[in-house]
Regions:
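Short metal-coordination and nucleic-acid-contact micro-motifs, chiefly zinc-binding Cys/His arrays
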Residues: 15-21
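Short Cys/His-rich metal-coordination motifs, predominantly Zn2+-binding knuckles/fingers
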Residues: 26-28
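Extended alpha-helical scaffolding segments
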Residues: 1-10, 30-180
Length: 180
């Protein structure tokens, strides 16, 4: 809107340096992260890293807010999610799969054997144990016949996140939450 009265009203109600705000991740009041750390390891994204949350043009600003204030995430939460994703997306991670153009990561909210079995089912078998994938799938198929659950834990939450390249940003392709 270009009306002067609206511009003045918005300017008065918004501070340029909104140091604190409500974090969209935790819901708690926290110092808002202006620029989020880069996430590396997403196939097809820039090798120097890319962001899930970023605003690089003034056209993306809303209600007079700039950069991170448009999607407020606390400094602690921004550090936590980017550090966790960088770890999950690292080359040596067994919790990372490539599904089409989506770099897919998965984890449980507490230690669970499913984290290893999930990778065994969907990834290429290791050269030193080419039958590992077959054993993991066999265990899943034999469990109902034997009358036991392959993993006896329906309280542990399990997360699957698919990330895809989108110019200088990272797009969330899919997000699934279930139980082990």
């Amino acid at each position: 809107c270009q009306r002067q009265a609206v511009i003045e009203a918005v300017s008065k109600s918004v501070t340029k340096e909104a140091a604190n705000g409500f974090c969209l991740i935790t819901g708690d009041s926290d110092e808002v992260e202006r620029l989020h750390p880069a996430i590396k390891g997403v196939w097809g994204a820039q090798t120097s890293g890319a962001n899930i949350i970023s605003f690089n043009l003034s056209a993306f600003n809303s209600w007079g807010k700039e950069q991170g204030a448009n999607a407020p995430v606390g400094k602690h939460s921004a550090f936590a999610y980017t550090t966790a994703l960088n770890s999950l997306l690292s080359k040596d991670s067994r919790q990372r799969l490539q599904i089409g153009d989506a770099s897919t990561v998965f984890w449980a909210d507490k230690p669970s054997p499913l984290e290893d079995q999930f990778a065994d089912i969907f990834s290429d078998p290791p050269k030193d144990d080419p039958d590992r994938n077959a054993r993991a799938i066999k265990a899943l198929y034999e469990a109902p016949r034997q009358g036991v659950a392959p993993i006896k834990d329906n309280q542990t939450r399990f997360f699957v996140l698919g990330l895809g390249p989108n110019a200088a940003r990272i797009a969330i392709r899919f997000w699934h939450v279930g139980t082990v």
